[in-house]
C-alpha cells in the first residue's frame, strides 16, 4: 500500500471521556498498560505498508506529540513521506476537520499517492488494510468503509454509526446506535478512496457549507457515490466513553482477545520507555492482570490493567480495576469493582 496516504483524523467527540481527556486528546489516552489508543490505528497503517501518514489533531496535543516523537517506533521516520502532524484549535466554531484539510491541501497534492485512507483513532482492532484496498478496487467503489456486525449493541458501541447495507454490501443508509437493537453493522469510520476524490470532497464541503466533516459528506451523498462496505470479523472496541474504555481494558485480559491484538502476524507498536521490570514482593498476590514495567506490587491484584510506575501497598486489594500510570495506592486499601461497574484510578 505504498501508493496510499494514511490520514488519522482526531476530530472525535470527547464529551463522554472528559475526566480522562481534559488535558490530552483521546488518541494519547493510556490503554492496555503500556500502549496509547492511537498505537492501534498507527500500527495497522504501517503494518499494511503505508509510508506516508498524516495526523490531524485539535488542541491539547502535547502528550500526543511526546508519544509520537519522530515516528521511529512505527518505522515512519523517513526523509520521504513518513509521519506528519497537523494541529488546529477547536476554539474557533467554524474551524473543523474539513477546514483543517483545506489549510493543508498541499500535503495531499504533493503526496502523489493514488489512494487516501482516512480513519479515526478510537477504533481498537488489528486490521490489514491491504485486504481493504484489494476489495475496494475489485468492487469498483468510489468509497469503501469498514464495518463489523456486532451482537448485543444495546449495551456496546453506543452513539456509533450504524450502516444499512443491500445484498451487494453497498451502503444505502446510515444511522446511529441508540441501544435499541440486538445487533448492528457498526461503521468503523475507516474510508478508502482515490486521493483526487478526497480533494474534491474537501472543496465541495467548503463550497456548499453544509458538511463540516468528510464522513458526514459521504453519508449525505450515498445516493450519488458508490459507497461499499468491507466486513471486518476480528475483535473491535470503540473508545468513545469511559465505560467503553474500561470494558476494552477488561477485554484485553481475555486470552483470545490478547493474542489476536498483540501476538498476531501484525504487532502493535508503541513508544518504548526504559524502566526496571515490575517488582513483586513476598506479600503480593497477582492473578489475570496486565502490569506495565516500573511498578512495585506489595498487595493483592486480580483482573486489573495497571500502567507504568504504579505502587500498590501491602495489604491493599485491587480487583477489576484500571490503574493509570504513576498512581500510588497506599497500604490496606480495598477496591473491589463488580463487572457491571467501571472505575479508573489515576494521580491528580
Q: Positions of the model-derived regions?
A:
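Left-handed beta-helix
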Residues: 1-7, 196, 204-348
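Unchanged
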Residues: 1-250
Amino acid at each position: 500500500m505504498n501508493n496510499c496516504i494514511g490520514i488519522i483524523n482526531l476530530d472525535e467527540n470527547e464529551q463522554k471521556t472528559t475526566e480522562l481527556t481534559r488535558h490530552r486528546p483521546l488518541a494519547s489516552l493510556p490503554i492496555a498498560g503500556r500502549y496509547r489508543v492511537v498505537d492501534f490505528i498507527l500500527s495497522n497503517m504501517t503494518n499494511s505498508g503505508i509510508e506516508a501518514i498524516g495526523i490531524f489533531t485539535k488542541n491539547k496535543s502535547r502528550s500526543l506529540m511526546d508519544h509520537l516523537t519522530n515516528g521511529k517506533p512505527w518505522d515512519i521516520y523517513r526523509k520521504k513521506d513518513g509521519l506528519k502532524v497537523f494541529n488546529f484549535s477547536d476554539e474557533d466554531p467554524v474551524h473543523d476537520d474539513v477546514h483543517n484539510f483545506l489549510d493543508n491541501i498541499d500535503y495531499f497534492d504533493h503526496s502523489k499517492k493514488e489512494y487516501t485512507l482516512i480513519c479515526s483513532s478510537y477504533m481498537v482492532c488489528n486490521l490489514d488494510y491491504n485486504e481493504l484496498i484489494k476489495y475496494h478496487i475489485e468492487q469498483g467503489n468510489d468509497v469503501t468503509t469498514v464495518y463489523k456486525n456486532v451482537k448485543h449493541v444495546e449495551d456496546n458501541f453506543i452513539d456509533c454509526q450504524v450502516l444499512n447495507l443491500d445484498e451487494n454490501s453497498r451502503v444505502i443508509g446510515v444511522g446511529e446506535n441508540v441501544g435499541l437493537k440486538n445487533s448492528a453493522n457498526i461503521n468503523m469510520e475507516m474510508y478508502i478512496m482515490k486521493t483526487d476524490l478526497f480533494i474534491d470532497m474537501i472543496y465541495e464541503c467548503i463550497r456548499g457549507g453544509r458538511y463540516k466533516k468528510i464522513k458526514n459528506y459521504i453519508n449525505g451523498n450515498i445516493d450519488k457515490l458508490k459507497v461499499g462496505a468491507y466486513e471486518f470479523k476480528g475483535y473491535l472496541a470503540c473508545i468513545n466513553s469511559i465505560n467503553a474504555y474500561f470494558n476494552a481494558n477488561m477485554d484485553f485480559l481475555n486470552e483470545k482477545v490478547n493474542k489476536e491484538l498483540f501476538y498476531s502476524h501484525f504487532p502493535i507498536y508503541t513508544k518504548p520507555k526504559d524502566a526496571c521490570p515490575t517488582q513483586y514482593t513476598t506479600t503480593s498476590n497477582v492473578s489475570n492482570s496486565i502490569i506495565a514495567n516500573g511498578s512495585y506490587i506489595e498487595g493483592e491484584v486480580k483482573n486489573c490493567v495497571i500502567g507504568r510506575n504504579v505502587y500498590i501497598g501491602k495489604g491493599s486489594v485491587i480487583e477489576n480495576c484500571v490503574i493509570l500510570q504513576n498512581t500510588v495506592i497506599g497500604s490496606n486499601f480495598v477496591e473491589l469493582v463488580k463487572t457491571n461497574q467501571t472505575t479508573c484510578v489515576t494521580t491528580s
